[in-house]
């Protein structure tokens, strides 16, 4: 499933939307979300840390297990273990930032293949 969601990620107003996404992505099983804050790297480490923490808190609050994958901020997009972590997700969530940067960081990588 692919869901393109504009701004507002991790806000209280998005709980119902994200709960529906989790339900549809994982069915009756427990949801496992991978949050990828790569698009925020140009805004600095504190912004990456903020998106990481917000995403983890938000989806854990919805009952999902959460793995934050910091591609470009300590983790490689071509690392097979990173790709495996992404492939294990029932929902992959790319948080806010610069979409063009995200595209350049992931295009043609093992991480992107795992997301598809």
Label every PLM stretch briefly:
Residues 99-109:
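Glycine/threonine-rich flexible loop motifs
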Residues 1-101:
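Extended, subdomain-level signal for the structured scaffold at the beginning of enzyme domains
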Residues 85-88, 108-116:
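Catalytic-core regions built around general acid/base machinery
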